[in-house]
Swiss-Prot record:
Parts of the chain on the Extracellular side: 32-35, 170-205, 256-277, 328-356, 420-421, 493-497
Annotated organism of origin: Gallus gallus (Chicken)
Record membrane topology: Multi-pass membrane protein
Any one cellular-component term (Gene Ontology): membrane
Alphabetized UniProt keyword annotations: Glycoprotein, Membrane, Transmembrane, Transmembrane helix
Name this polypeptide is given: Transmembrane protein 104
Glycosylation (residues): N194
Keyword Transport tagged: no
Family: Belongs to the TMEM104 family.
UniProt key word Transmembrane: yes
Cytoplasmic side: 1-10, 57-148, 227-234, 299-306, 378-398, 443-471
Subcellular location: Membrane
């Protein structure tokens, strides 16, 4: 996510893009949503989920608009540079001044109709053909302070991402293997385990968790010191596993409900659970930082905003189905932070393979993503401190940056493995900035720059449906209000303890 223009890659159809976006948004956050739903109450959860889905869609259209504006400016700068190069060639050649004046007047006559067409909404100048990452857009439209705040926000978000991933794998391994060690398969039967309970012999559950965390760090941590990327086949495999797991959980919960074995009696509203639910929902709708690599390769972008809207409706329906089947199938106090662990109970499913597949599902999928996110965070650190023309010493480049990437999240999850809180805090703070504040500022600043460069009559063909300034102000007020609300909620909760 470091700012820069990268290759667009192979083009694909709008509907393939719709599938890719669905897969991008529906990830780890969905596994923590059922617990957050149960804690906040079904009505509050549904209303908040729908509202936050709408807000996320709005800011997604802001980012698409900013991408189009960035592409237009890059084209305009290249046109200006070519014009300057041509003038330099003319001045260095032996042509007379009168010839140069004649050619200049001819060029101006040729360019005037082009510019007037662009102001009426030419499909060319605002076409999204180059992948301009969010960091590059921030550099184009923000001042130096804004760029630094952007990188600070995205770095904090990626730290939260790494912490969630680093905790999810050891938690899943601890829950499954400690149950085996106790000759039981009742991880999700409602039995409350403490961290000090025995796992195997003298080893406590918290000790097992930290051993798994150490092994996870030693196995995947070294990838932070190298360059890795997710291959096409690995992406297909992890996506396939994810959808098999989600479909299995929904079907198993529906079967249990249809047989009259449902235990859930969710409340309508519990305001104390809103803080975590807010963070989980924001985290679960997060896609804005990856939109450039997702939208740019789409071959036909004429109706891209409608396709994105369709995606959000499908995702909203999926989240609702997953969460409602969960809260009616399981009692509130038995729902686990990682929803997959509720299906490791023999009473839910007596097929051992399915139990272990669901219980260990986060281990496989998250382990493939961890090195990629770590390398992305490392590269953002490098971009933040980079100075034009400068290079980093070998020690700083190969040791210091990877170390400051890996150590902080591992230390955090060494002290806590509360996944719901980790997801909630990451979404409520850094996620809030990336999903609401940055897109709103990008839309506002890109509109100002577009008017400055092309004139007030310019029409961006990818202009957001929420084009009135009111919507930008609304998103900014909402984003800052969320910061205040979540912080006040945390302070008040801590003061009651």
């Amino acid at each position: 996510m470091a700012g820069g223009i990268t290759d667009t890659g192979e083009l694909y159809s709008p509907y393939v893009g719709l599938v890719y976006m669905f897969n991008l948004i529906v990830g780890t956050g969905a596994l923590t949503m059922p617990k957050a739903f149960a804690t906040a109450g079904w009505l509050v959860s549904l209303v908040l989920l729908m509202f936050l889905g709408f807000m996320s869609y709005m800011t997604t259209t802001f980012v698409v608009e900013a991408m189009a504006a960035a592409n237009a400016q890059l084209r305009w700068k290249r046109m200006e540079k070519r014009k300057e190069d041509d003038e330099d060639e003319d001045s260095s050649s032996g042509v007379s001044d009168s010839d140069v004046l004649l050619r200049d007047s001819y060029e101006r006559a040729e360019t005037r109709p082009i510019l007037s067409v662009q102001r009426r909404g030419s499909p060319n100048i605002f076409e999204i053909t180059e992948r301009v990452e969010m960091g590059q857009m921030a550099s184009m439209f923000f001042n130096k302070v804004g760029v630094n705040l952007f990188y600070f926000c995205i770095i904090i978000y990626l730290y939260g991402d790494l912490a969630i991933y680093a905790a999810a794998v050891p938690v899943s391994l601890m829950q499954v293997t400690c149950a085996i060690g106790n000759h039981s398969c009742n991880v999700g039967d409602g039995t409350k385990y403490n961290d000090t309970d025995k796992c195997w012999g003298p080893i406590r559950r918290i000790d097992a968790y930290r051993l798994y965390l150490a092994a996870f760090t030693l196995l995947l941590g070294p990838f932070t010191f190298f360059n890795v990327q997710k291959t096409k086949y690995l992406q297909i495999m992890t996506s396939l596993m994810r959808w098999i797991a989600f479909i299995l959980m929904i079907i198993l919960a529906l079967i249990r409900i249809s047989r009259g074995q449902a235990e859930g009696h969710p409340s309508m509203a519990q305001l104390s659970g809103i803080r975590n639910l807010f963070g989980v929902c924001v985290y679960s709708f997060m896609c804005q930082h990856s939109l450039p690599s997702l939208i740019t390769p789409i071959s036909k972008k004429r109706h891209v905003n409608k396709l994105v809207l369709l995606d959000y409706i499908l995702i909203l329906a999926f989240y609702s189905l997953l969460s409602f089947t969960a809260i009616y199938c399981f009692r509130n106090d038995t729902l686990m932070d990682m929803y997959t662990l509720n299906f490791t109970n023999c009473e839910i499913i007596n097929v051992a393979f399915i139990r272990y597949f669901l219980g260990l599902f986060p281990v496989f999928t998250i382990s493939t993503n961890f090195p990629i996110i770590a390398v992305t965070l490392r590269n953002n650190w490098k971009t933040l401190f980079h100075r034009e023309g400068g290079t980093y010493p070998w020690l700083v480049d190969r040791i210091v940056f990877p170390a400051i990437t890996l150590v902080p999240p591992v230390l955090v999850v060494f002290c806590t493995h509360d996944l719901e809180s980790l997801v909630g805090i990451t979404g409520a703070y850094a996620g809030n900035g990336i999903q609401y504040l940055i897109p709103a500022f990008l839309a506002y600043c890109s509109r100002k720059d577009t008017q400055l460069v092309f004139g007030s009559g310019t029409v961006n063909k990818h202009l957001s449906p929420f084009r009135h300034t009111f919507w930008i102000v609304f998103v900014l007020i909402w984003g800052f209000s969320c910061f205040v609300f979540v912080t006040a909620n945390i302070v008040l909760s801590e003061s009651k303890l």
